């Protein structure tokens, strides 16, 4: 006969976040000793975290606090929408914004109330039963607009964008910058301006464009113009200021911003499961 009650099992679950069967087994093994049961669960959790390390954390959410953005990954969308997972992400991004860290590595090495963030994530992994990864963290200075996108109403945000801007910084300016953040979320630019594209990337695009044109048997005299056109198409696809604006596809983003009196100086885009 067990020397603990259903209320004891519930209390242990509430205290540790462990499942009902795990809590019951721990109390049975501990012969009703509450502190020993907690220790048993902590040991089991630590072992399970090690087993989970080889699994893939491809789900999760993007959280923000003011001018900071964070991506926290888990294994299933079921966990991604739980209150405890959402709360952990929010706690971490708020701490990151306050503490002055600038990367996920720095955030993991920092402490919350004396406990290391890496240890806190590992503890939550043990409680939840899935591999958790604090994948990315970024923070911008100055005036910043934010946009978060949900891929389904019952899921937390999976895409997050921060846009740092100058110029018109009133309510209208914020609306314009947020519109650009929505463009970034949807169109996935990799660079802000042509000047930000590494020279080796441009050169690679030129080589590919020329090789493709030759394989298509294009006239030799036409190659320079064809190559230039295809490189410009690359810029229009991957450079924010060169993209067609989603609000007016007859104008590039740079023209829309110039007319609005807003200048984008930097942006950050996180999407769950993508680099």
Swiss-Prot record:
Compartments in which it is found: Cytoplasm
An example Gene Ontology molecular-function term: translation elongation factor activity
Keywords: Cytoplasm, Elongation factor, Protein biosynthesis
Gene3D superfamilies: 1.10.286.20, DNA helicase RuvA subunit, C-terminal domain, Elongation factor Ts, dimerisation domain
Domain of life: Bacteria
Database matches in SUPFAM superfamilies: Elongation factor Ts (EF-Ts), dimerisation domain, UBA-like
Region ranges (Involved in Mg(2+) ion dislocation from EF-Tu): 76-79
One GO CC term on file: cytoplasm
PROSITE patterns linked to this entry: EF_TS_1 (PS01126), EF_TS_2 (PS01127)
Function: Associates with the EF-Tu.GDP complex and induces the exchange of GDP to GTP. It remains bound to the aminoacyl-tRNA.EF-Tu.GTP complex up to the GTP hydrolysis stage on the ribosome.
Protein family per UniProt: Belongs to the EF-Ts family.
HAMAP family, sorted: EF_Ts (MF_00050)
Name this protein carries in UniProt: Elongation factor Ts
Top-level taxonomy: Bacteria, Bacillati, Actinomycetota, Actinomycetes, Micromonosporales
